[in-house]
Amino acid sequence: MYFYNMLNLTPFLLFDGNCAEAMTFYQSCLNGELTITKIADTPMKNHMPPQQHHKVAHAHLKSSGIEFSATDWLHPKRTPKPGNTVAMYINGGKYDELRKIFDSLATGADKALVDDLQDMPFGTYGHLADRYGVHWFFQGGKAA
């Protein structure tokens, strides 16, 4: 897993089980370097049912000035539908920077759509849908 030293904002796509196929297609169109990490290849597999181990935990495509990330839909209580499959992705920086931005964007958000920042095997992770319905994913270094 990679992290930027500074905060970075890129699009983040969510797929319904076909993330690897879609990202491979995008690579064939855009060229560049594609990395795909499946659930089975991460410590997350110990917290997920075996039928989800083939899914993509994180994919990243970078080609010249084009860069975006993606995942297969993994939230057990929400389902993908048009309108919630594209999000903003804030990656990198220090925990305190992520926390400040997360808390600011969470102001007025529907609490049912907020997954607070928490330490995960790959670093800090969190998600929220802001007061306008825009989904934001956060990933970075762990809290000190």
Give, region by region, the residue ranges found by the protein language model.
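Vicinal oxygen chelate
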Residues: 2-7, 35-37, 55-62, 69-73, ...
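A structural signal for short, well-ordered beta-strand segments
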Residues: 11-13, 86-88
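Glycine/charged-rich beta-loop-alpha catalytic/anionic-binding loops adjacent to active sites
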Residues: 83
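Core segments of cupin and vicinal oxygen chelate
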Residues: 13-65
